[in-house]
Each structure stands twice: as C-alpha cells, then as structure tokens.
Amino acid sequence: MSADEKKGHGQRSERGRGPGGPGTQPRIPLASPAAWLVLIALAIFLFRAFQDVGVRRIPYSQFKEMVRQSAFERVVIGPDWVRGVPKPVEAGAAQGGGAQPQQQAQGEGERNGQALPYVATRIPGGGDDLVQAVEKAGVPYDAVAGGGMGDLFWVWIAPIAIGLLFWAWVMRRMSGQLGQGPPGVMAFGKSRARIHMEPDTGVTFQDAAGIDEAVEELQEIVEFLKTPEKYRRLGGRIPKGVLLVGPPGTGKTLLARATAGEAGVPFFSLSGSEFVEMFVGVGAARVRDLFAQATQKAPCIVFIDELDALGKSRNAGIMGGHDEREQTLNQLLAEMDGFDARAGLIIMGATNRPEILDPALLRPGRFDRQVLVDRPDKRGREQILRIHARNVKLGPDVDLRSVAARTPGFAGADLANVVNEAALLAARRNKNHVTRAEFEEAIERVVAGLEKKSRRINEREKEIVAFHEAGHALVSWMLPFADRVSKVSIIPRGLGALGYTLQLPLEDRYLLTRSELRDRMAGLMGGRVAEEEVFGEPSTGASNDLQHATAVARMMVRDYGMSPALGPVSLGDQNGPSFLGVKGFETRSYSDHTALAVDREVQALVEEAQDRARTVVREHRERLEALAARLLTIEVVEEDEITRLWGPKVVRPGTIEGRGHEESPPETPNRPVAASADASAGFGRSGPQPPQALARHAGGDPDPES
C-alpha cells in the first residue's frame, strides 16, 4: 500500500464512526434533543403571540355593561373567561350608551367586515351575577366546562414532552458520545477509543531514547504489521498481546504511540478506567464494541493504558474489586481468545502494577510478551536529554553528559522536567542561553524541592541545622562505603526541610553489600549524633533520619538475611515487584517470638550505626565545626570546598578516589528521586530497584516544631 493510499485510509477512518461505519450520511440536525427543545420553545412563543389575534380583549366591567345593553348576539361562558359575539350593526345605527362599543367593533375591531368577538377575564368564585344579567337581557348563552384541547396540551402534553426531551439530552451528554459516534441513551455501550493514525501520532522509535531493549522487542511487532508473510512462511505466530510494564514516567505510552507510528496502522488508544462507569454491563459492552471496531480496521494496534484499572486480579484477597469490573475483565479475556492473530490485530497494554493483574490475563495466548520499560542508565539519560534539549538554546558551559551523570534514577518524564525547569529559570533571569547554573538549580529543585526564601528561622535553629547537616556530611565522608557528598545546604526547601545534604553518584549500581548498608545507616544517624555532641540533646529534625535508618535495618534483618541471630532467612512478604514503591497490605507469616527477635535485631543495628557515627564525630570534631561555621556564613557548600576543608573522601581500597556509589532506597519512593528526608538505603522487596539520587534533610517532617 502506498503512502497516499495509507493517508487516504487514515482520512476515511477519521470520519463518523456510527453504526453504518465510514461513509454514513450525517445526522439530520432535527434529530437532536436540543433542536427539539428549541422548536417547542419557538412553538410556545408563536402560540402565545397569535393567541389573541382573532379576538378583542376588554375589561370585565365593560363586558357586563355591554351584556346589560344587549350588545351581544350570543355569549359563551368558560371557567375563567367569557366571550361575546357582537350583534351586526347597520350603518349609522347607534343607541344610547352602547354606541361607543359598537363603533369600536365596526372600526378597529373589524375583520373581513365582521366585528371581532369580545373576550374578558371572568372573576373566579361566587358572587358573580353574569348569568342573571345574560338571562335578563335575553341573550342566548352557552357554557364550557373545561379548558378544551388547548388546556390539555399546555397542562399535560407539553410539560411531559419537554421533560422527556430534556432527559434524553442529559443522558446523551452523560454517555459522552457527542461527536464520537451514534448519539442517544443507548450509546453507553459504545467504545470511547480514539483512533490515531500515523500522521496523528507523530512519534517514531527515534523519539523513544534510552529504552533500546524495549524498542528491539517491539520492532518485531512493527515488521509483522508491515510484512506478515515473513513470519507466516515459517509457521511463526506473532504475539496477540504485548504488556509494557515499568515505573511511572519511563515512556510506556510514548513507546506504544511510536510502535503505531512506525507501522503506519490505525492506533486505538484508551484508558482501562474508561470501560467501567455507572451502569452495570457497560464495560462488557464497550469491550465488545472496541474489538468490533478494531477488527474492521485491522491490521491495527489497540492500546489500553493503565490496564490494572481493568485487569485487577479476581482474587478475593485483593480489595477494591466488584462484579462490574469482573464482568468487564471476563469479556476482555473472551475477546482476546476469540480474535484471529492472523488478522493483524495487536493488543498493547501498559501498567506500573503488574503484580495485581489477573493471572488469566498474563497467560500465553493473551498477553504473550511482557516488555520492561525501566529507568534509563547514564547513556540512556544522555540520549533523552539531547532529545528534550533539541529546541533549547544551550550555553557553551552545558555538558549534557555531566547532567546525565548527576541524575541517576531519573525517568524520562523527570529529565524532560529538568530541561523545562532549566529553560524557565533562564527565561526568568532574562538570559539568552540556558547555562549550567540553571541545570544544577533544576536538578536541585527536583531532588530537594523549591527554595523557601520566605521561611525565616532564628539563629539558634539555624545553628542546629548547620551542625545537623555537617554531621551527615562528616560521617558519610569518613566512612569508606558511604556515598560521596555533592552539596550541603541550610537553605529551607520543600515542605519541611530546613537543610539538606545532597549525594549524587557518578555511576549506576544495583547491588548493596552489608558493609554499604551499615555505612549508609551510620550516615543517616550522623545528624542526630552531631546535635547530641554539640548541644547535648537531639531535636525533632532527626525524626525522618530515624525512620529511614529503622527501615534499612528492618529490611536487613527481615528480607536480606543479614542478621547473625536469625540467620539466612527471609521473613518478608513477597508479592512481586512494585514499580510504584509503595507497600500494600502486609501479612505476617511468623510467630510473635520471631517478631520480637526481629525488633531486637533492628534496634541493635540502629544503635550500632549510632555508635559508629558518634565515634566519627568525636574523632573529627574540628572538621565538623569548620563545616558548620562555613555553612552559617555562606549557607551552601559544594563538594570542592568540602575537599579543601577536610581533604579527599575516605574510600575503600581498590577504588578511584572520590568516585561515588549509588544504591537504591529500601522502598522506591513515588518520585524518581529521594525528595523526602534521608531516603537512603537498601533495595526493593523483590530485588534491586533503580538507583536514586540521595538528599538528606534536616526537619524532614512538615511539622512546625521541626
């Protein structure tokens, strides 16, 4: 198929997707409930406007006077009105007091030479002597019991019709089908999938940098969609479904769009949460409609983002499920079994919670292949930075390779945010180029939060923060297995951080030893120990340090088998990898006696870390005071100045001096970098998590006392 034919195919697919498919005639505007409401309102206006054209209204008192004068040929009495037909008047005839009304009837009250009937509003209730007056005058009269068909229409038919039309309009709006397919109340079961053709995606694999392995896996999908005979002649079967898993912000949606852009096929994109709404059975109907549309457009790609919202496990132990979601999932499973893989229909899903997906969804024949879209390494980060910096005017001092080295653990979305923040900072400062200073400030914003220049702290608290951060830096500097210190600051940042110690490694690492964990915990306790040694007591600013040190110790004892007392056993609850870095509901599978032993070992490890930190602080008290004094003077101290004050960092034998190490946190935080206090040790419950930049804060909790 030529490019022009593909383009034409794409244009046909973009037109109305009603029951008649492409080429369906446009809807008549009068079929819209809103149009009917306008027509009814116009009819009411016209009826009211012309209601009194054929009659002449007069006051009720004048009507009674004309009855007494026998001016009417006949009278009709209604529930709240009376109508009188005037007698024919010969030319020049006029009598007594009735002359004036008769002249009016002959003059301005004429139509086709006939006098118009007179109509007056009758006084309701008793005491009305109109009937007696009519009988006395000898005028024939009649009575109407009800309001006739007019009243029936306005009292009953019109309000009901307006209410039904308004309800239909509301249901149409709620169904979300305006401009997206067949309108009306029955459109709830229609899929909300948006069709993106190749010109619309505008993304190819060249835009998906830093995830080369994932691109290589998906290249097979592209080649199958372009040349399926290459695989069919050897008896191969392309996977029906591809599941993209990985942390947030790593480019899963971008990769799916790039796959469709490379293949040049229709791209159905929707979220898993769009299947389930207020009515039971809507989700299953939308699944059926989605696959019906996709089969007509094959070869094509159907991309379901946030698949966990739809495909959560049906296990009763997992909270949050209900019958509607289960029915929708069952329909999806049936549809994925039902379509023929040879038709060229590829299902792609994306999730960052693969551990909660239903096993039936992941079996071969449905989502055959899982592609990990992980955080990029140093080389990948550099490639991503170059893509996002293509339209940014960089200064001569900007080295993107150095920026990539200073951003371990950053996902693609975070790197895009860094470039954008740097450009905004340069524009705010009225610069012509984005310099290295803006990139460093942007990284610091992501790691530690925004500067709180308006937060004023007194001299006593400022001195405590200075010694606290100097304690963190000193212990980490003097222990061989701790991370190198990049920057120390006592400028308040974020929600509750009054200061921070920034540690940015130069390399990516994925394993930790027991010695590295012990030195990490000692560095965490360095701030609290420095406060005790200088001021005689700790402050609330060390609360977050204690939380993270305890978390590291507990994982060493319970998950990693690093406690001599308990031995090489794992007591943690293994539920599979979690890319969100948060724990669900934990179940304890050991006795109370073992739990008490775990608590004792955790306490022993934390106390050991505190003793080691205290030894370092006491041995190097002069260096601690020198850095604290420097912080009180200039507030921010870089690594080069720390080296001039203390000398080179103590490193383990066999390593390059000053070369840092990076380890993952015990539970990967939601943000790609450790922006909370002392996020600093261990790796995930099910294996090493991606490396993280470290920022130790004083006053980590947003507490007024901190």
UniProtKB/Swiss-Prot annotation:
The chain crosses the membrane at residues 30-50, 151-171. ATP binds at G246, P247, P248, G249, T250, G251, K252, T253. InterPro entries: AAA+_ATPase, AAA_lid_3, ATPase_AAA_core, ATPase_AAA_CS, FtsH, P-loop_NTPase, Pept_M41_FtsH_extracell, Peptidase_M41. The keyword Nuclease does not apply. Residues 51-150 are periplasmic. Residues 1-27, 88-111, 651-706 are annotated as: Disordered. Zn(2+) binds at H468, H472, D545. CDD domains: RecA-like_FtsH (cd19501). It is a multi-pass membrane protein. GO terms for cellular component: plasma membrane. HAMAP family: FtsH. This is ATP-dependent zinc metalloprotease FtsH. It comes from Anaeromyxobacter dehalogenans (strain 2CP-1 / ATCC BAA-258).
